[in-house]
């Protein structure tokens, strides 16, 4: 170690994730009539609707919406205020939408401009004449998550290069040129991904890792033709979770009824285990889709959106890890890392090989934001091992080491239902660690830093396993025993000792300590 001063620069495991999603939409300029706003939400409270969507998925603060009723007012607002997104509802009364978009971008180069139509007749007319002027065009279908979808699609497009480069955030490509269909798909895809990501937060060891997981959710990128889809695949091949595509869409400037199948063939030739879902209104396409090792979904199905959600959940690593045999027979389920490790130790070797050959383990880890662990597993092939038992041993030991590393130097939020005795430093209850607890936590983190480990050869310095009862639990103890008033009065040591000795612990805290 060159200098003890270097320790001042040490960072937490999640510090490198802090720069994820650097671009966030904070202010939206919305151009609409009052009636159009009423159509979006019956009571007209668009901001409340957006706030509720952000709260549902535990997202950071929702953007502010500034509404104007004309293109002229919008251009004036762009000159005087900062906005990250412009949304135009239907057509404008005082200016051609394409002309408005050009002027808006002249004032604010690079600002995303999105058109939201209400009727198919508006949509066709607008797309025919002005589509190139807009970043995206959507049609309002009554989906309350539409506004959230537009925001996240724009943010993903801006952030994807940096976020994949920095930590390997994963990407899902949607290929669809029908505004009606992608206006239905995208809200469902974002809702499903955010819902599953939120569900994973209960597995996080503390609030820092919870924040990381929300920032590290997969990005969704939209392509409307073959060339754009192929370009996205080639750029983000290393980070792809999967592809969801129509079969019929433009290729070489002309509508091609086999474009999706050709795209799947090209991708599967290079990444054979990548999940691909192809969709068509023509059931006869199913056999051709099967021939290129992709899944098929009929667009005319009454359960289209439900089946799409099931595909995302099953193939992109969300939900429980379900150990199956090659014939689909379910053997066991793992809800968390400990259960995955336990199952890996005993599950049928045929199931272990089946999942390893398809990168199911690394996909499941990636969905949980565990990119480093996934990178340890993904390069290894089944053929690298002498037999399935050597594969089992490697997987078990890698998971065991990871669980230990994951706890090292970290303050873990105690949860009775998932406590397994591996945590080195626990916090029990809500609130602050307190001064002494915070000092111990800092020293524990410091001693797990590599610079300290190598500073004194032959010497191991560590903090004993620790549990800190936080201020929230202490406040509950004081309140339950009516000790707050007592503490504020003047009493001698014997009286204070007697009062606290005779007090009882809150039942929740007592159960935590017994665990």
Residue ranges of each PLM-predicted region?
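Conserved phosphotransfer microenvironments
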Residues: 6-10, 39-51, 60-62, 67-75, ...
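Cofactor-binding loop segments of dinucleotide-utilizing enzymes, especially the Rossmann-like FAD-
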Residues: 33, 70, 118, 177, ...
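Short, charged/polar "capping" segments at the starts of alpha-helices
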Residues: 37-40, 121-125, 182-183, 284-287
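Hydrophobic/aromatic residues positioned on beta-strands within the core alpha/beta folds
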Residues: 116-118, 279, 299
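N-terminal beta-alpha lobe that positions the nucleotide/phosphoryl donor
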Residues: 334, 339-342, 347-348, 352-515
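As written
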Residues: 97, 127-137, 288-296
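Proline-centered loop/turn at the N-terminus of a beta-strand
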Residues: 110-114, 136, 171, 274-277, ...
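Non-catalytic signal-transmission and effector/linker regions of two-component phosphorelay proteins
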Residues: 1-66, 102, 130-136, 140-219, ...
């Amino acid at each position: 170690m060159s200098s003890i001063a270097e320790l001042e620069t040490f960072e937490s495991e999640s510090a490198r994730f802090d720069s994820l999603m650097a671009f966030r939409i904070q202010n939206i300029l919305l151009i609409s009539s009052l009636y159009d706003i009423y159509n979006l939400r019956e009571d007209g409270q668009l901001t409340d609707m957006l706030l509720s969507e952000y709260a549902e998925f535990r997202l950071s603060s929702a953007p502010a919406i500034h509404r104007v009723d004309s293109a002229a007012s919008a251009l004036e607002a762009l000159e005087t205020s900062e906005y990250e997104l412009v949304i135009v509802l239907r057509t404008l009364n005082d200016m051609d939408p394409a002309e408005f978009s050009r002027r808006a971008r002249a004032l604010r180069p690079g600002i995303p401009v999105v058109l939201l139509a209400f009727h198919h007749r508006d949509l066709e007319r607008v797309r025919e004449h002005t589509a190139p002027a807009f970043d995206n065009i959507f049609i309002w279908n009554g989906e309350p998550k539409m506004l959230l979808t537009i925001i996240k699609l724009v943010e993903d497009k801006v952030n994807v290069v940096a976020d994949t480069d920095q930590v390997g955030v994963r990407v899902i490509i949607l290929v669809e040129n029908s505004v009606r269909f992608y206006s239905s798909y995208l809200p469902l895809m974002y809702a499903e991904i955010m819902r599953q990501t939120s569900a994973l937060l209960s597995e996080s060891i503390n609030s820092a890792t919870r924040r990381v997981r929300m920032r590290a959710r997969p990005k969704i990128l939209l392509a409307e033709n073959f060339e754009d889809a192929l370009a996205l695949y080639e750029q983000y091949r290393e980070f792809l979770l999967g592809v969801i595509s129509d079969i019929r869409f433009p290729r070489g400037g002309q509508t091609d009824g086999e474009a999706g199948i050709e795209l799947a063939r090209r991708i599967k030739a290079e990444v054979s285990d990548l999940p691909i879902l192809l969709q068509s209104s023509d059931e006869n396409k199913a056999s051709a889709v099967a021939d290129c090792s992709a899944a098929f979904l009929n667009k005319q199905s009454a359960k289209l959106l439900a089946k799409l959600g099931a595909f995302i959940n099953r193939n992109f690593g969300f939900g429980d890890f379900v150990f199956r045999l090659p014939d689909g027979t379910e053997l066991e389920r793992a809800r968390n890392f400990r259960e995955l490790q336990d199952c890996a130790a005993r599950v049928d070797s045929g199931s272990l090989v089946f999942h390893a050959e398809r990168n199911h383990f690394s996909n499941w880890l990636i969905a949980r934001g565990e990119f480093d662990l996934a990178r340890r597993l993904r390069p290894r092939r089944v053929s690298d091992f002498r037999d399935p038992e050597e594969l089992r041993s490697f997987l078990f030991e890698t998971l065991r080491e990871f669980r230990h590393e994951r706890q090292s130097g970290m303050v873990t939020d105690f949860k009775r239902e998932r406590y397994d005795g591996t945590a080195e430093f626990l916090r029990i209850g809500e609130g602050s660690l307190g001064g002494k607890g915070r000092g111990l936590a800092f020293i524990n983190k410091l001693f797990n830093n590599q610079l300290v480990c190598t500073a004194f050869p032959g010497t191991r310095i560590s903090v004993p396993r620790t549990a800190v009862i936080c201020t929230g639990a202490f406040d509950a103890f004081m309140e339950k025993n009516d000790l707050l008033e007592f503490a504020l009065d003047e009493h001698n040591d014997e009286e204070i000792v007697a009062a606290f000795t005779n007090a009882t612990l809150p039942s929740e805290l007592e159960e935590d300590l017994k665990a």
